[in-house]
């Protein structure tokens, strides 16, 4: 197997409103370099400020490149993050994102 390069300067698709917003205006998301890999999928994700429910049911690892915000798991305390931080979400983690400053992250979703 050979390495897969995922370029940071990949072109992003058009922004779309999140489907489960909990604030107005709805946050906008867009992705770049989405690729299938042997364990799932990977790419870049960007989101404007706002609150919304997490919609990914698979396990996910996220490394934040820029921005800041928090994630509050259902029944838990907020987890604040900023550029340079990383979060691992176990499968079926549910909760609410609160994006304070536009966030860009690299992610791996495990199937």
Regions found by a protein language model. Name each.
Residues 54, 71, 105-107:
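Short hydrophobic/aromatic-rich beta-strand segments that constitute the beta-sheet cores
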């Amino acid at each position: 197997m050979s390495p897969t390069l995922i370029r940071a300067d990949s072109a992003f698709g058009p922004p779309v409103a999140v489907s489960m917003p909990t604030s107005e205006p709805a946050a906008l998301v867009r992705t770049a370099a989405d690729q299938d890999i042997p364990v799932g999928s990977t790419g870049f994700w960007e989101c404007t400020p706002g609150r919304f429910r997490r919609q990914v049911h698979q396990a996910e690892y996220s490394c934040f490149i820029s921005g800041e915000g928090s994630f509050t798991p259902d029944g838990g305390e907020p987890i604040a993050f900023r550029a340079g931080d990383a979060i691992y979400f176990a499968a079926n983690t549910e909760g609410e994102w609160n994006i304070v400053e536009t966030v860009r992250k690299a992610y791996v979703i495990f199937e």
